[in-house]
Amino acid sequence: MKTVKISAYYAILLALIALICTALSTGIYLLTKSKIEDEINKQRQALLLEVVPQAYFDNPLSENCQRPNSEKLRAQRIDRLCIATKNNQKTAYAFETVAPDGYAGRIRLLVGITPTGTILGVRVLEHQETPGLGDKIETRISDWILSFSQQQLRSDNLADWAVKKDGGKFDQFAGATITPRAVVNQVKQSALSLLDELNQEN
């Protein structure tokens, strides 16, 4: 009988400890949730400014983002589209897209583009490429990704939109052609899809 009472006591004690720990964890989460969300929003806004400079818009760009309705855009793996406006005129777009064929898997990109096809900037949001080789797509490692800035995408220069090994004008990396090829191809194809969609709207 005494053993049963002791066991019940410890069971209740453990339950109370678990309850207190859960309450503390929940409290910490609730206290830090807004700070974490604020930090994520700040990082997102900073990245948006890297691909669509402030001079292009006077609207709250990060608040004007949504999943595109167009099946064509979604088929090109454009899963988030932000619209920049200035004086109520659409001046640029920022979109997230995924290159599915990186050396080590998917490469998530953020692309800024004008309605006339000028690439304002490209940044890598996420990747798993090989350190020392494919990770040169990051600005902290290399300035390669900056080579997209101010490049014009037109029907008469599509052949240029490839790595040099494939006859284009973009550099590849020594020992790592697959990664830059995947990025160039995805920027090209997704941007062309967006421009085609915009032309149909007009």
Curated annotation (Swiss-Prot):
Membrane topology: Single-pass membrane protein
Any Pfam family: FMN_bind
Keywords recorded for this protein, A-Z: Cell inner membrane, Cell membrane, Electron transport, Flavoprotein, FMN, Membrane, Phosphoprotein, Translocase, Transmembrane, Transmembrane helix, Transport
Entry EC number(s): 7.-.-.-
Location relative to the cell: Cell inner membrane
Residue list for modification FMN phosphoryl threonine: 177
GO cellular component: plasma membrane
GO molecular function, one term: electron transfer activity
GO biological process, alphabetically ordered: electron transport chain
Transmembrane segments: 11-31
InterPro entries per the UniProt record, alphabetical: FMN-bd, Ion_transpt_RnfG/RsxG
Cofactor(s) required for function per UniProt: FMN
Family label: Belongs to the RnfG family.
Subunit structure, interactors included: The complex is composed of six subunits: RnfA, RnfB, RnfC, RnfD, RnfE and RnfG.
Function per UniProt: Part of a membrane-bound complex that couples electron transfer with translocation of ions across the membrane.
The protein, known as: Ion-translocating oxidoreductase complex subunit G
Organism: Pasteurella multocida (strain Pm70)
